[in-house]
Amino acid sequence: MEANNNTKGILFIMIGMAFFSIQDSLIKYIFEEIALFELYLGRTIVQATVLISIFLITKKKFTLKTHYPFLTLLRVICFFFGFSFFYISLTFMSLAMVSALFFSCPFFMSIFAKVFLKEQIGIRRWSAITVGFIGVLVVLNPTLEDFNFFKLAPVACSLCYACSMTITKYTSEKDNIYTQLTLLYIFAVIASVIIFLISGDGKFNNFSDPTMQFIFREWFVNPAVSWPYVFVMG
């Protein structure tokens, strides 16, 4: 039974990664037409709409009450910053390089699983993870002469994602997936709206660098072009 569940889990991960690849390609295509957190807000609204539709169709019951308030807050913060780091990295790095650096995630996740979840990880898995992490170091090219700290953005994303997934694994014992998703979307909307109220008019966009413009650009400048893609990504 456990082997069958592992196979299903791997299959779902592969399907999810395929969809993420499509999303990442679309982000690289439209990032000059939209602000970072406008994109984040749009995706969240679409995903929340899908989730609400599932609730209405299946008549599933859920609650906003969590048994792990602190861990839940930490999880949604990690998700928020993790995706932000990833989106930012797509503005100045190739999709292939970002994806390669994101593969540092299994390294962090395995450490967290061992330390915090007390899971047993065999020598074969550690060997595969180590080889993968060496590949990440090769891509980073961490030499003192020309090391680019901006390349750490997808690695920071991996660290945040590994942290959030570890917390999700732990809290799933009492909090169901619908509660966790709903709280994630609520936090993302609140955080995005706050950022919009502070900088949504573009008053801090005094930069010529495309990445910094992506972060501080005025919101809703060209929604007819950007939001159809946001809808697809959601």
Whereabouts are the PLM-identified features?
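Hydrophobic/small/kink-forming positions within alpha-helical transmembrane segments
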Residues: M17-I22, I52, V76-S84, P106-I111, ...
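Membrane-interface helix caps and helix-loop-helix hairpins in membrane proteins
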Residues: I88-M93, L140-F149
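Structural motif at transmembrane-helix junctions in multi-pass transporters
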Residues: E32-E38, F85-F102, I177
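Specific transmembrane alpha-helical segments of multi-pass solute transporters/efflux pumps
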Residues: K61-A96
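Membrane-interface interhelical linkers
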Residues: M1-I15, T49-L74, I123, I186-M233
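C-terminal transmembrane-helix exit sites in multi-pass transporters
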Residues: C105-S127
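Hydrophobic transmembrane alpha-helices of multi-pass small-molecule transport proteins
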Residues: R124-N141
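Transmembrane alpha-helical segments that form core, pore/gating elements
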Residues: K28, F37, D146-F204
